[in-house]
Amino acid sequence: FADFDLSKISKNLPKLDIQKINHFQKNSLRAMDINDIKNEFSKLEDLAITEKEWNLIKDNIEIYENIIELLDIVRRKKIEIAPNKEFIKLLKNNISEIKDLKFDDYISFLIEKDNKLSKKDIFTNTRFILTGNNNGPSVKDLYLFFGFSGLERILNEFETL
């Protein structure tokens, strides 16, 4: 953003609309590819953000600080919420059957296994398993990002119930 010029946004700087700047920042960040991000922000180079991570988080970026926040969430460095123990147990008991399921089939399978589960229960607990957080990319995108091996690895981190 070295070429950024406020005078091109408003002729009257005291009347500068912060919302317009934030909108511009959001759209600019989301339009960048991984190489642009690494070149523009040296701190992100130090964090070794991957193209796969960038593609996962970029549509959730509002401001620059969100990049680091979302990266911490996706990398499970900001665990705040634990999933329901019964949900973990359900996944562990059916892990071999979940292995090859696409996201929508995963949801249907879990509802079939436990008809007390709502889609919301599945989405929130899956998010809590994968990120330990309420925020972040969509649960479907997280499921695709981590894949079965990531889900299984994280499940194995939870104590045996």
Predicted regions and their residues:
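Conserved nucleotide- and phosphate/pyrophosphate-binding catalytic cores
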Residues: 1-161
